[in-house]
Design a protein with these regions (language model features):
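Adenine nucleotide-associated cytosolic modules
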Residues: 1-268
Length: 268
């Protein structure tokens, strides 16, 4: 254990004592690089738990500022950071929790023009976005780049999580081939969301990330996990890989990233 400082041995002692983690596993976490899309309801708990676990490099991208309505569920922010960029607020929170962690704050919008450059040096991508254009863009980019993706979504009292391993299982388009028509599915702003729900789903996403880094346990490959907060139920839905999927199928028809946002706005 000489590769750890005394502080690290204490900080990560509950990890190191686990046979499935140990010193080698903790080193994997410290050397890992994770890219989180969104510093809101899902990105906050994902980043917080990954920072606590000692994931060495965490990048977050988000173009928004902290608003009072965020504080009902976005645990990395506070009244002291109102009006400040969400990524800077989250960076300060995570680095205050664990100075071992390098948090890279990117205050900009993810797009087809920058996503491949952003994710190329990261081991795992986490999607904590709150809109369909971003969700499809992230899925397609990760499939094309061969990057594992942990995707989460929340609305009202329900959340879902799935893990996508390009070349070894389904992708988001195997589940939902095309975006729903604009306006069909309301946003959290329009329909609301239970404040604790992002914590449950974000915690599950963080768990998937840690298992991927450690190479332990079973991840949600070819499965969609659905949580209902009102009923306190979890259920798994099988999601087989679609051989005719336009992105990850045998003969993909989508071979370059599209301007999903413009397409979605046009549908509105």
């Amino acid at each position: 254990m000489s590769e750890f400082t005394e502080d690290q041995l204490q900080r990560y002692s509950r990890h190191i004592i686990l046979p499935e983690v140990g010193g080698k596993g903790q080193k994997k976490l410290l050397n890992a690089k994770v890219f989180i899309i969104g510093a809101g309801g899902l990105g906050c708990p994902v980043g917080y738990y990954l920072a606590a676990a000692g994931v060495g490099t965490i990048a977050m991208i988000d173009n928004d500022e902290v608003e009072l309505s965020n504080l009902q569920r976005q645990i990395a922010h506070s009244v002291k950071t109102l009006g400040k960029p969400k990524v800077e607020s989250a960076k300060n929170t995570f680095e205050s929790l664990n100075p071992d962690v390098n948090v890279i704050a990117l205050k900009q919008r993810i797009s087809k023009n920058n996503i491949m450059e952003f994710i190329k040096d990261y081991d795992i991508v986490v999607d904590g976005s709150d809109n369909f254009p971003t969700r499809y863009l992230v899925n397609d980019a990760c499939v094309m780049a061969g990057k594992p993706l942990v995707s989460g979504a929340i609305l009202r009292f329900e959340g879902q999580v799935t893990t996508i391993i390009p070349g070894d299982g389904h992708c988001y388009r195997c589940l939902f081939e095309e975006m729903p028509p604009a306006g069909l599915v309301p946003s959290c702003q329009e329909a609301g969301v239970l404040g604790v729900l992002p914590g449950v789903i974000g915690g599950l996403q963080a768990t998937e990330v840690l298992k991927l880094i450690l190479g332990k346990g079973d991840v949600l490959k070819n499965e969609l996990l659905i949580y209902n907060a009102l009923k306190t139920t979890f259920r798994k839905v099988k999601v087989p890989k679609n051989p005719d999927c336009p992105v990850c199928g045998k003969n993909p028809t989508i071979t370059e990233l599209l301007d999903y946002d413009a397409e979605y706005c046009t549908m509105r």
